[in-house]
Amino acid sequence: MKLIILTGLVLFAIVSLIEAEEESGRVCIPLNGECSKSPDKCCDNINCDCYLRFEKGVQTGRPCFCTEKDVIFERDE
């Protein structure tokens, strides 16, 4: 009986540690942070917006940044 209780407590501790590690890995990306590799990790009320980058007519990348929701950026000419 003691062995069953001890085994249950050990399993509970292991599961708790695994859940704590998962939560610590969920740190959000702040405003203007780069989110190309993890677009779903921007902080609350912030979106991950991406744009295509071209150099001499050739696409050279797709950078993404966490920006405020409902904000539209326009190019200055």
UniProtKB/Swiss-Prot annotation:
GO terms for molecular function: ion channel inhibitor activity; toxin activity. Expressed by the venom gland. Disulfide bonds: none annotated. The keyword Disulfide bond applies. Keywords: Disulfide bond, Secreted, Signal, Toxin. InterPro entries: Spider_toxin_CSTX_knottin (IPR019553), Spidertoxin (IPR004169). It is found in: Secreted. It comes from the Eukaryota. It holds the Pfam family Toxin_35. Residues 21-26 form a propeptide. GO terms for cellular component: extracellular region. Contains 4 disulfide bonds. Residues 1-20 form the signal peptide. Belongs to the neurotoxin 19 (CSTX) family. 09 (U10-Lctx) subfamily. This is U10-lycotoxin-Ls1a. It comes from Lycosa singoriensis (Wolf spider).
